[in-house]
């Protein structure tokens, strides 16, 4: 990988948090560790992450609430639940809230790495599908437009993009 995938790792167990972050950094991930749900939400509001690893059972804001907020505020963020207190019910709830994957601790590092790569690939696919759909919606009116209308629309689109880039 050329550039590093940026991960937010949320766990209240200090030793586990340090260990998993160190292992992921050795595998060329950029890792930001936080030890509470509140810190996770705050960090995600300040930085752009591609993936979040979230523990479920934490004091204060629990992992399900973190998942709910992260998916609402950052729809492109893939969230993987990594918990030592898992159950079928919590896995179902997490999936319904938008979790990409649900893992139980202890977790094999190679399996976690595979899930991280798949989550990153899914994120890219979703963004491309979204951008393709957005472009189709922008260009659809041009299909039936006269040549002069097409030219005006393309000019407006070009000016709009230039304005967005200059901000």
Predicted regions span which residues?
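Short hydrophobic/Thr-rich beta-strand motif most characteristic of the beta2 strand and flanking loop
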Residues: 28-35, 43
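Receiver (REC) domain active-site loop signature in two-component systems and cognate sites
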Residues: 58
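CheY-like receiver
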Residues: 123-167
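Short amphipathic alpha-helix used as the core "switch/output" element in two-component signaling
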Residues: 42, 64-76
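Acidic catalytic/metal-coordinating carboxylates
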Residues: 5, 35-39, 61-65
